Amino acid sequence: MNFVKSYCPALEELFRNSFKRLHRIAISCNDRLLVPQYRDGGGRISEQELKHVFIQEFLSCPTFEGWKYSIETPSVNIYKFTCGHKPLSEFKIGPDHGGRSANIDLCLYCDNKPSVLIEFKANNPGHFEHGKDFFKLENEPNDSLKYFVELYQNTDKATMKSIEEKLFINTYCKLPENVSFLGFSLYDKDLRGPAQIVVDRTTTPISIKAMKI
């Protein structure tokens, strides 16, 4: 684990570079990857675009030469998040609850061992959607780095409050200690430009803020 941890700075720089490229794509369309358009002409950017750009950056980065990756990787554990179509108030883990394997959005392998688990989200979905990914990442048994990466179309003070609640006041599952959060906003209204959403766990209470990127 200590060896893999040494890659944290390079990984987080890779996430930032991926976002910067996606931001350029969103404002200029000068890339082979196009932003899909709604009927009204507005662009629709999701976690899929960010994941795609990240994979391209990962494959071209010399630091990760020899590493491999897999998409929608089945989880080691069995999980149950819903009963019928209703979210469970308490998520279940293990084979005794009638659950099934979940999927990890992206897994990176060093020496053919799962070393980095990544979940991508976009546009601030609900507490349940966040909590489900937090629970899944927290409980996967392999000794790997774990990231929750979220893309926001735009942010303001109200959005920041909503993000904070979903990360730290989530009744389904809060952001675990063993999971790193990286958030990116294509346009922060206060900063008037793209921003990284930064979590500081060293403060009490934990602080969250937008910073220019």
Identify the residue ranges that each predicted region occupies.
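Acidic-residue sensor for enzyme active/binding pockets
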Residues: 47-49, 72-74, 119
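Charged, often low-complexity linker/regulatory segments
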Residues: 1-59
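Active-site metal-binding core of divalent-cation-utilizing nuclease and nuclease-like domains
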Residues: 42-43, 66-112
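Active-site-adjacent loop/helix micro-motif of nuclease/hydrolase catalytic cores
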Residues: 116, 124-135, 157-163
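Hydrophobic beta-strand segments of well-ordered beta-sheets in folded domains
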Residues: 116-117, 143-152
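Domain-level recognition of nuclease-like catalytic cores that cleave nucleotide substrates
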Residues: 151-213
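Conserved catalytic cores of phosphodiester-cleaving nucleases, focusing on short active-site segments
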Residues: 106-124
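Hydrophobic, Leu/Ile/Phe/Ala-enriched alpha-helical segments that form helix-helix packing faces
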Residues: 18, 22, 26, 54-62, ...
